[in-house]
Curated annotation (Swiss-Prot):
Belongs to the pyridoxal phosphate-binding protein YggS/PROSC family. The lineage of its organism: Bacteria, Pseudomonadati, Pseudomonadota, Gammaproteobacteria, Vibrionales. The modification N6-(pyridoxal phosphate)lysine is found at K36. Pyridoxal 5'-phosphate (PLP)-binding protein, which is involved in PLP homeostasis. The keyword Transport does not apply. GO terms for molecular function: pyridoxal phosphate binding. Keywords: Pyridoxal phosphate. The keyword Translocase does not apply. This is Pyridoxal phosphate homeostasis protein. It comes from Vibrio alginolyticus.
Length: 233
């Protein structure tokens, strides 16, 4: 058994344990393998171990991986998630190649993704990125701006609003982590009254996954714990 396969099995077991401990429905939390900077060989290894959802942060790198698997493994069942910032000049590539986008934080990007989504593809599944910590260094709309952006997305035929995503403040104690995640979970509950179709909370990474699951996360984004340390060289 490869180390990547072992890591996936270990993390999946931890997710199932956390679900049970919190009284969550079994298998209600999806594992998103963050494969940025990782070679296609590592992604293939994870895919062969049963992992089907992968997250990419960089447009060019992500598109090259999508194209590689489409060419060499045309029957693959990989679901590609874009989880990085989107520049206007790169939006077409995202619209044409990815299945999900987690980082919509302004109307201009939502409109461009809608207009540039090829008609033969299913609607792009999208999440609104919310800046729950209020840190200027983090992207995302404020909680007050979420409803206006959600209203716009709901009217765009080539986008399907699925929920919310956040990158919380970097805190190490469990209660602070839980508090951060509960903000987004509460916002999702409020949003559901107007948009009952939303079902996704993308929150939680290696260091705060357990708190995210307790707060209601439905998708955790795990990279290093699956693939090892990243190489940015």
């Amino acid at each position: 058994m490869s180390s990547i396969q072992q890591n996936i099995e270990h993390i999946t077991s931890q997710i199932r344990y956390d679900e049970q401990k919190c009284g969550r429905t079994p298998e209600s939390v999806q594992l998103l393998a963050v494969s940025k900077t990782k070679p296609v060989e590592a992604i293939l290894e994870a895919y062969q171990a049963g992992q089907t959802a992968f997250g990419e942060n960089y447009v060019q790198e992500g598109v090259s991986k999508v194209q590689h698997f489409a060419e060499h493994y045309p029957d693959n069942r990989i679901e590609w998630h874009f989880i990085g910032p989107i520049q206007s000049n790169k939006s077409r590539l995202v619209a044409e190649h990815f299945d999900w986008v987690h980082t919509i934080d302004r109307t201009k990007i939502a409109q461009r993704l809608n207009d540039q989504r090829p008609s033969e593809l299913k609607p792009l599944q999208v999440l609104i990125q919310v800046n729950t910590s209020g840190e200027a260094s983090k992207s995302g709309v404020t909680e007050a701006e979420v409803f206006e952006l959600a209203e716009l997305i709901s009217r765009l035929p080539n986008l399907t609003l699925r929920g919310l995503m956040s990158i919380p403040a970097n805190v190490s104690d469990y209660e602070s982590q839980l508090h951060e995640f509960q903000k987004l979970a509460t916002l999702k509950q409020t949003l559901e009254a107007q948009f009952p179709e939303i079902d996704t909370l993308s929150m939680g990474m290696s260091g705060d996954m357990t708190a995210a699951i307790e707060a209601g996360s439905t998708m955790v984004r795990i990279g290093t714990a699956i693939f090892g340390a990243r190489d940015y060289s």
